[in-house]
UniProtKB/Swiss-Prot annotation:
It comes from Pelodictyon phaeoclathratiforme (strain DSM 5477 / BU-1). NCBIfam families: maf. Its cofactor is a divalent metal cation. The record marks 14, 76, 158 as: Important for substrate specificity. Pfam families: Maf. Gene3D superfamilies: 3.90.950.10. This is dTTP/UTP pyrophosphatase.
Length: 192
């Protein structure tokens, strides 16, 4: 019996790029789910629940594989205090998010799920990031240049312009990009 196939059920090019660093062959799969946060649950519970919903959606779309397919999904949000920052709806929301995140620390939460038949691994990884102050013009330039509308918190830590404003990071860099690679690899070993 060969090794199971790995499917990254995500439309994120950043997650695809991160997972490719492992040199493990995988396929990607686009799925559509509602990413609804439950205000009565913790941030960790929310991102893990959304990642699980994505995995279950992907599993429902795949033919039965007799335990030969591992599905990987993830969900990322940014939070400062009790405020959660998802993906911005447009320029104004992106501007407001970056304005409020600058010059103070915030946390990036990524929940990920590995699913294969009846075996499920769920985990949430948290990284603290602190941004330098940014002028209104610097924020505008960043948004117009990088168009961060598909990124939680309105920024990509990997974006060249953002490198100028990262004061401190505590935890996993790849988590901030969208997939905590070291934790995913550790969990993946139990499936292979």
């Amino acid at each position: 019996m060969g090794k199971p196939a790995l499917i990254l059920a995500s439309q994120s090019p950043r997650r695809r790029d991160i997972l490719s660093l492992t040199l493990i062959p995988f396929e990607t799969m686009a799925i559509e789910t509602r990413e609804t946060l439950d205000p009565t649950s913790s941030i960790e519970e929310n991102v893990t629940k959304i990642a699980l919903e994505k995995a279950e959606c992907a599993a429902a779309l795949l033919p039965k594989q007799n335990g030969k397919t591992i599905i990987l999904t993830a969900d990322t949000v940014v939070a400062k205090g009790n405020r959660i920052y998802g993906k911005p709806a447009g320029f104004d929301e992106a501007f407001e998010m970056l304005k409020s995140l600058q010059n103070r620390s915030h946390r990036v939460y990524t929940g990920f799920v590995l699913l294969c038949c009846d075996k499920i691994h769920t985990e949430c990884v948290t990284t603290t990031v602190e941004l330098e102050p940014m002028s209104d013009n610097e924020i505008k330039r960043y948004i117009l240049s990088e168009k961060p509308y598909d990124k939680a918190g309105s920024y990509g830590i990997q974006d060249p312009l953002m490198a100028c404003y990262i004061r401190r990071i505590e935890g996993c860099y790849h988590n901030v990009v969208g997939l905590p690679l070291s934790r995913v690899c550790k969990a993946l070993k139990t499936f292979l």
